[in-house]
């Protein structure tokens, strides 16, 4: 009984599987028949279209820019540090107790402004003593001169000897010398009193105070009272390769001050503009560079002592230069070249001679002319004589290109 029961179940399962397989097979044939007419129609239409696709594929998309003619400034660049035109540590020239400070930390001061005071009592006393001694010796001199006058009259009648007359004359001369010494003592005491009032020796900005009121200070203190840095004007010291010396000297011979620009650490913002002050008198043999100093008015306090900046010095301007985007300039086995577009948007390779350049623009001295269109993007897909599709043409007459040109003219280039 159990064996026949299992056999029936096996037969049922086999029948169900066979039915499902037959259904799938029949459904697949119907789908093939319904798709056949469309496929046949497509097959009838495809040969011509297929041959057309083989003959002409899609055009390579490129971006292009127009070569323009413009004046291009040439800059020499270097790294530099802002230095104060003068740095003065204000120290006391006399010993005594500091009784007053007359400045605020960070304040701009003028030469002669009162900065600090030392207790003047001892200096006033010394001055009074010197003045008293001077007055005493002046009285002695006056009396000696009167005696000399009497001796001279008596000597005419031989009432006094020649020796006595000479002695009186010597006394007068001695007293006159004493007077001069007294006058020097008075001047010295007055100077000590004057030095008890400490004034600014130069214009500039005071730093943080180095000593507090009430402290005893002396002329031998090395830290001083405060440091003044002169920042109006302020200097920039930067270095240039020794190969640039001839260029700078030649530009100086033109007779016009050379403009130097100070840019921030990231070279993205111009901080100030000044002029070349001088070149150092020797080259650093270790680095092969020479130090250059420029001076800035710095009335807006844009520059600060010990600030790191990028320096750019204008040495020449190339007029009527043919300029293209730097992205268009390529380098191959033959040398530098660009891809030039003709009126039919077909490209051809032109060997060129580049001049001064920066990250945005490059001057082309030979190989193309102003008005030529050059490929700036999509260059890796180009072959000689290929026709391309210009998807974004740029020209120096567009607002965007004008802005780029202005930025280029502002930043300049370096050969």
Curated annotation (Swiss-Prot):
Keywords: Cell inner membrane, Cell membrane, Membrane, Signal, Transport. The keyword Cell membrane applies. Disulfide bonds: none annotated. Residues 1-21 form the signal peptide. Induction: The mdtABC operon is transcriptionally activated by BaeR. One of its GO terms (molecular function) is bile acid transmembrane transporter activity. InterPro entries: CusB_D23, Multidrug-R_MdtA, RND_pump_MFP. Gene3D superfamilies: 2.40.30.170, 2.40.420.20, 2.40.50.100, Helix hairpin bin. Residues 399-415 have a biased composition (Basic and acidic residues). It is found in: Cell inner membrane. One of its GO terms (biological process) is bile acid and bile salt transport. The MdtABC tripartite complex confers resistance against novobiocin and deoxycholate. MdtABC requires TolC for its function. Belongs to the membrane fusion protein (MFP) (TC 8.A.1) family. PANTHER family: MULTIDRUG RESISTANCE PROTEIN MDTA. Part of a tripartite efflux system composed of MdtA, MdtB and MdtC. This is Multidrug resistance protein MdtA. It comes from Escherichia coli (strain K12).
């Amino acid at each position: 009984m159990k064996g026949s029961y299992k056999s029936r179940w096996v037969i049922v399962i086999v029948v169900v599987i066979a039915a499902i397989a037959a259904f799938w097979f029949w459904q697949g044939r119907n789908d093939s028949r319904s798709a056949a007419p469309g496929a046949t129609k497509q097959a009838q239409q495809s040969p011509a279209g297929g041959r057309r696709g083989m003959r002409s594929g899609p055009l390579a998309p490129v971006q292009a820019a127009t070569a323009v003619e413009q004046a291009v400034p040439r800059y020499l660049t270097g790294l530099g540090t802002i230095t104060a035109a003068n740095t003065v540590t204000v120290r006391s020239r006399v010993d005594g107790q500091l009784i007053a400070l007359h400045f605020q930390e960070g304040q701009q001061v003028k030469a002669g402004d009162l900065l600090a005071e030392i207790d003047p009592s001892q200096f006033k006393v010394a001055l009074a003593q010197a003045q008293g001694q001077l007055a005493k010796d002046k009285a002695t001199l006056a009396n000696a001169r009167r005696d000399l006058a009497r001796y001279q009259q008596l000597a005419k009648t031989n009432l006094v000897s020649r020796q006595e007359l000479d002695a009186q004359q010597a006394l007068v001369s001695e007293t006159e010398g004493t007077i001069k010494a007294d006058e020097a003592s008075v001047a010295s005491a007055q100077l000590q009193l004057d030095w008890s009032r400490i004034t600014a020796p130069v214009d500039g900005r005071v730093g943080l105070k180095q000593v507090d009121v009430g402290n005893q200070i002396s002329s031998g203190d090395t830290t001083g009272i405060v440091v003044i840095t002169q920042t109006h004007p302020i200097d920039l010291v930067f270095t240039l390769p020794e190969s640039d010396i001839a260029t700078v000297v030649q530009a100086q011979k033109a007779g016009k001050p050379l403009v130097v620009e100070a840019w921030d650490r990231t070279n993205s913002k111009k901080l100030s503009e000044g002029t070349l002050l001088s070149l150092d008198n020797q080259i650093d043999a270790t680095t092969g560079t020479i130090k250059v100093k420029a001076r800035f008015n710095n009335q807006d306090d844009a520059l600060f002592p010990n600030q790191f900046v990028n320096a750019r010095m204008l040495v020449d301007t190339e007029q009527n230069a043919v300029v293209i985007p730097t992205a268009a300039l390529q380098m191959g086995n033959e040398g530098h070249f660009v891809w030039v577009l003709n009126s039919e948007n077909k490209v051809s390779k032109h060997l060129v001679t580049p001049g001064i350049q920066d990250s945005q623009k490059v001057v082309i001295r030979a190989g193309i002319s102003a008005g030529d269109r050059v490929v700036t993007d999509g260059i890796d897909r180009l072959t000689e004589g290929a026709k391309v599709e210009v998807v974004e043409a740029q020209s120096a007459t567009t607002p965007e290109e004008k802005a780029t040109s202005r930025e280029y003219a502002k930043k300049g280039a370096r050969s």
